[in-house]
Structure formats: structure tokens, C-alpha cells
A protein has these predicted regions:
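Short, low-complexity disordered leader/linker segments with a strong preference
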Residues: 1-26, 352
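Paired acidic/hydrophobic, glycine-rich loop segments that form the ligand-binding mouth/hinge
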Residues: 74-78, 212, 229-234, 250
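A ligand-binding cleft/hinge motif common to bilobed small-molecule-binding domains
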Residues: 84-86, 232-247
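Conserved C-terminal helix/tail region of periplasmic/extracytoplasmic solute-binding proteins
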Residues: 323-352
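Early extracytoplasmic/lumenal segment of secretory-pathway proteins
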Residues: 19-87, 220
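Mature extracytoplasmic/periplasmic domains
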Residues: 258, 267-329
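Extracytoplasmic ligand-binding site segments that recognize negatively charged/polar headgroups
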Residues: 78-84, 88-224
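Periplasmic-binding protein-like
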Residues: 195-196, 201-205, 242-268
Length: 352
């Protein structure tokens, strides 16, 4: 009997090992920079799996794919704070077992305390990174950082400006019109009349727009080819352009800017939830968070990443003055009338 039990135990162990040794593939739908080999390769090697990423250009693209029947194609997604709640509360994401994500307790309390990815007493996502949508500019054209988003409307830069194909461009125009005063949250609940005025403001910008970019690669190419001199962008592009030795500057203008808190979530349709959970734990570990910051230039959700950074690196990421830096960023919120915002933005894009 004992021999039979030993044989069964050995068979079970070998079978489990064989199943684990099969190369599983985690499919990601995430923002650019969130599956870089610089930090993903180590996970692939230690877990004998492959991480395959598709990149999204906007929150609306993510939502469209999840709602359009493509959810089963992805295991892990990285929704921002404007759509994370909708995804967490509509059955598109799987609840997390936080006991299997021990690094969750190390994440910044001001992020984990937010209700963005919580529903019915369950948590559906882990904060990953956060940051602004800054104004990027060619330092050979601007010897001093531009002080206002209004520079994008300056007639001298006709055909030399780029804006993002995202509602962030709508928010930016609304800021110039003062709709963020006194409550920045009002940017995400504009009235029809306010949206019409935003539309008119953006139509005034059209002659200056060389191209409306939708991927980071598009924007970096526009700068490198000297087709544009200024744009709304991401810190990721600043990092990439500096690595390419392009004279790029980054600033938050006097009106401040919008920004995001990105989460990592597991889709409800994933067939690899256990492996995906291990991946989320890996991504929010302090050492990995430092590597993510190196690639993206985004602020890590795990403050422990700072222990692996030099004083200069911490300063570049504003970790030496996080609270004041956060005050300059109006983090994206759920937009109840998102369809109306998109209608306005699409009309701007279609206008000649």
C-alpha cells in the first residue's frame, strides 16, 4: 500500500512538473513600455513562460476591445484611472487574491486606498505607475520651457504641433478655458455648452497641428524628423528621445495638467489566472518597479523602489517632493458622459 502511495505521489509530482514546464503565454493589452524586455525577460525565464504584449493608444481603445469580444484574447490589462472602475464593476476583470500578491502591502497607501478598482469588498487591480501628460518641446526652438498650454495655439508654430488622439486633448483645452476652476474634477463632467466651447477652442488649434498621434512611436518620430516642435506627450517619450540624444524638454505648464494612475488587472476571461497573479506580484515588487521607472520615466506605485535609485534618479522622478508634484496633476476620473466627449473630439478630428 505504501509503495502504491509513493508511486501515486511521484506520478502526481511529475505530472504537475510537466504541466508547469509547458510554455504558457501571458497575453497583455497594456500601455507602451509596460512589457519591456528590460524587466519582463527575468519573469519569463524564472517562470518558463512567454509574455506577449499588444499596445493600446488610449483608454477608449482598451474598452472597445474588451467590450467588442476580444477580452478572451488577453490575460493582463493596464487600465488607467478613467476606466478602471468601469472594468472592475462590469465583470470584465477577475478579483485578486491579495494573499498571493504580498508586495501589495508595500504600495503607496494613497493609491491602494482609492476606490478605483474595488467593488463588493473585492480588489480587482494593483496600482502600477502614475504620472502626468506633460508638454514636450524641442529645446533648440525653446530656450526656456513654455509656461502655458496656449503655446500650442501660437500662429508661429503653424503645422509644427502634435496632439494626442485621446480625451486628454479635450481636457487640456478645457483647462485653458478655465473649466478646472475651482474644481479640477469638473474637467470630467463638462456641460454641453462647455463642450461646444472646448470644441471651438480645438478647432482654432487645427491649423497648427501637423499630426494627431496615437502611439508613442509616432510622436518620437515626429520630433526626431523635426516635423514638430511641441506636443502633449508622456514621460516615456521624453526618456526615449533623450536616449536617442534628441534635445527634448518636458514641463508642466502654469495651468497644470491631467494625468493617470495605471493599474494592472487580470481579465475575467483569462485561462492563466495563477500565472497572471504571479506576474502582477513580480511587477509591483520594489526592484521591478525601479526597472519599470528606468524604462518609462513614470513614478512607481511602490515607494520601496527608491532604495534602488540614486539621489539624482529620485529627484528626476520627483520622489523627493511627491506631494507637491501630485498637486500639479489632475488625475483622470470616470467620465459619465464619455460618449459625448468622444463625439466632440471626433468632430474636431473630422473638421477640415
Amino acid at each position: 500500500m505504501r509503495r502504491l502511495l509513493v508511486t501515486l505521489l511521484l506520478f502526481t509530482t511529475l505530472a504537475a512538473t510537466a504541466c508547469r514546464s509547458k510554455t504558457a503565454t501571458l497575453n497583455l493589452l497594456v500601455w507602451e513600455g509596460y512589457a519591456d524586455p528590460a524587466f519582463v525577460r527575468a519573469f519569463e525565464e524564472s517562470h518558463h513562460c512567454k509574455v506577449s504584449a499588444s499596445y493600446m493608444g488610449s483608454s477608449d481603445e482598451l474598452v472597445a476591445k474588451l467590450r467588442g469580444g476580444s477580452a478572451a484574447n488577453y490575460d493582463v490589462i493596464s487600465p488607467s484611472s478613467d476606466v478602471a472602475t468601469m472594468i472592475a464593476t462590469t465583470g470584465l476583470a477577475a478579483p485578486l487574491d491579495l494573499a498571493k500578491i504580498p508586495s501589495y502591502s508595500q504600495l503607496a497607501p494613497q493609491l491602494t486606498s482609492l476606490p478605483l478598482v474595488k467593488s463588493g469588498g473585492k480588489v480587482y487591480g494593483v496600482p502600477f505607475t502614475w504620472g502626468p501628460n506633460p508638454l514636450l518641446y524641442d529645446t533648440t526652438v525653446f530656450q526656456q520651457p513654455p509656461t502655458t498650454w496656449a503655446v500650442l495655439w501660437d500662429p508661429k508654430y503653424r503645422g509644427k504641433i502634435s496632439v494626442w488622439d485621446d480625451l486628454s486633448t479635450v481636457y487640456m483645452a478645457a483647462q485653458l478655458l478655465g473649466y478646472d476652476k475651482p474644481d479640477p474634477g469638473h474637467l470630467y463632467s463638462l456641460s454641453d455648452d462647455e463642450l461646444e466651447k472646448v470644441k471651438a477652442k480645438l478647432l482654432e488649434l487645427k491649423p497648427n497641428v501637423r499630426k494627431i498621434w496615437s502611439t508613442g512611436g509616432e510622436l518620437t518620430n515626429l520630433f526626431e524628423n523635426h516635423e514638430i516642435v511641441a506636443a502633449m506627450g508622456w514621460p516615456l517619450m521624453t526618456n526615449q528621445l533623450r536616449q536617442a540624444h534628441f534635445p527634448i524638454g518636458e514641463t508642466i505648464p502654469q495651468e497644470n495638467t491631467t494625468g493617470w494612475i495605471d493599474h494592472m488587472m487580470i481579465t475575467a476571461a483569462s485561462d492563466h489566472k495563477e500565472l497572471a497573479t504571479e506576474f502582477l506580484e513580480y511587477l509591483v515588487e520594489a526592484r521591478t518597479q525601479k526597472q519599470v521607472a528606468d524604462v518609462t520615466g513614470y513614478i512607481p506605485a511602490n515607494p520601496g523602489a527608491a532604495q534602488f535609485m540614486s539621489a539624482e534618479e529620485q529627484k528626476n522622478l520627483h520622489l523627493d517632493d511627491v506631494q507637491n508634484y501630485q498637486k500639479r496633476i489632475y488625475f483622470w476620473q470616470n467620465v459619465p458622459r464619455r460618449d459625448k466627449y468622444n463625439e466632440i473630439w471626433n468632430e474636431v478630428k473630422a473638421a477640415q
